[in-house]
Amino acid sequence: MATLNPRDVVIVDGVRSAMGKSKNGMFRNVRADSLSAELVRALVARNQFDVNEVEDLIWGCVNQTLEQGMNIGRNIGLLAGLPKTVAGQTVNRLCGSSMQAIHTAAAQIATNQGDIFIIGGVEHMGHVGMMHGIDLNPEASKHYAKASNMMGLTAEMLGRMNGITREEQDAFGVESHRRAWAATQEGRFKNEIIGVEGHDANGFKILCDIDEVIRPDANLEAFKALKPVFDPKGGSVTAATSSALSDGASAMLLMSAERAQALGLKPRAVIRSMAVAGCDAAIMGYGPVPATQKALKRAGLSIADIQTVELNEAFAAQGLSVLKGLGLYDKQDIVNLNGGAIALGHPLGCSGARITTTLLNVMEQQDTQIGLATMCIGLGQGIATVIERV
């Protein structure tokens, strides 16, 4: 178990919503800010502390327009009933946004710029399309290929560079669904999912506490029958081996070790190190490799010390390429044990805090000590966080 210093950054708790389908899903009548506010209220209710002490609410969100616009972080705090004295901000590092929220809060805690932070992220991809309102500079094509904006093509590129076969991708995708459904049936998500009111297919109100995107019937035969979707003629990436479009939110409570101790709150983990890194936009999915290497060096660890891993499965080709790059290809029994984004979906701004929360729960379930959460980021970045249970 880790020994804590006063300014160490500890994770007190983490929660998430169930993941809803973006097309006519269970959250089709629920706004992104309302969904997020439910999680903030739940986080406060689960942990006894004075909310007046919260320095800032930091929320990750990628497409900050429509219901996700006008500093959704501040709006979430107000909707959740936090005191008006609690500040709120929204951060955007594309797919890594809510992990960046963790890093931003952690840096402030470590430098004594606040003791208690609520962080999280959200993306309602059913209400706010991924490309809604986007106007890219034509000059950018001088610096990276236009095709680098098409995530599926970057996955195809990684697959070819790293010799990832169609068969490997299909098997990886099926296994993601199998693990996620097994985790659901065995109650392994219960500690992290907060039930939020939504609607079933017939329009009746229901409590949404089971991930809607998982396919319990996922099988190799069905996956093999699908045609490549991004490179129809010579590709290998299909809809089934890509992360699903989904709607969801996540939230975490971070504190300084000394404040958590003073409040009598038992930390679940301490943040050992953090890192971001850039890479070529054409292989954006490889970003977790340099980011993880940086984070491990800062923690004084090697990949062999990592006992549990959560990696954002943007695509099977991407995930498998990262595992090869990190030397984890033959250690998939420690990676995404409760399934990944192929089964759960990847609501962009939500995913960073979601996978970190899931990592924490898996570490507790497996009784492991040191874990890694890492993600690729569009336009060529990676982000990584190393945590240790306390």
From Swiss-Prot:
Disulfide bonds: none
SUPFAM superfamilies, A to Z: Thiolase-like
Localization: Cytoplasm
Residues annotated as the enzyme's active site: C95, H346, C376
A GO CC term assigned to this protein in UniProt: cytoplasm
Family the UniProt entry places it in: Belongs to the thiolase-like superfamily. Thiolase family.
Name listed for the protein in its UniProt record: 3-ketoacyl-CoA thiolase
Highest classification ranks of the organism: Bacteria, Pseudomonadati, Pseudomonadota, Gammaproteobacteria, Moraxellales
